[in-house]
Regions:
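Transmembrane-helix bundle of Major Facilitator Superfamily
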Residues: 2-176
Length: 176
């Protein structure tokens, strides 16, 4: 049996100490929550701002593809990024996903047409596909099964907070 044939919990993780301190775990959870917030708030900002975006870019017939393209690439890549995190380590895969997500987000802001926006949303979804599975894996690495429900509660609260902040931010962006 090779190293890559063993279950993930039996494999060494390249980018974490054997027994991280509570302070380090807190910092890591904060960073993971921030990454998740970026992906979560993006959806609600776009949902609020998209009618204005479509009015400026045209292409109403492509409206649903702005969301569908993002979700399709995000969903399709979740398993891929989970495996890559097992092979290459959690940190580099999460950071690469965040970078791809941010590049896609920036390019969305400069989109000149609806097809361009959809293409950039595909890129954004690709990056977002790494955030959720790698975040859950990091929590599994850092916390015992007994501690995980509490931390998963913190991570879940990010989605609730994003649901409040996103529409407000989207409205401000549209009105600015």
């Amino acid at each position: 049996m090779t190293m890559h044939d063993r279950p993930a919990h039996d494999r060494p993780v390249h980018d974490r100490p054997a027994h991280p301190s509570q302070a380090r775990r807190t910092v890591v959870v904060g960073c993971v929550m921030l990454a998740m917030f970026m992906a979560a708030v993006e959806v609600t900002i776009v949902a609020t701002a998209l009618p204005q975006i479509v009015a400026k870019l045209g292409g109403f017939s492509l409206y649903t593809w702005v969301f569908a393209g993002f979700l399709l690439t995000q969903t399709a890549t979740i398993l891929v990024f989970g495996k890559l995190a097992d092979l290459y380590g959690r940190r580099p895969v999460l950071i690469a996903g965040i970078v791809v997500f941010l590049v896609g987000s920036t390019l969305c802001g400069f989109a000149w047409s609806m097809p361009a926006l959809i293409g950039f949303r595909l890129l954004q979804g690709l990056g977002a596909g790494s955030i959720q599975p790698v975040a859950a894996t990091i929590i599994g690495d850092l916390y015992s099964p007994r501690e995980r429900p509490r931390i998963q509660g913190y991570l879940s609260s990010v989605w609730g907070f994003a649901a409040i902040v996103g529409p407000l931010a989207g409205g401000l962006i549209v009105e600015a």
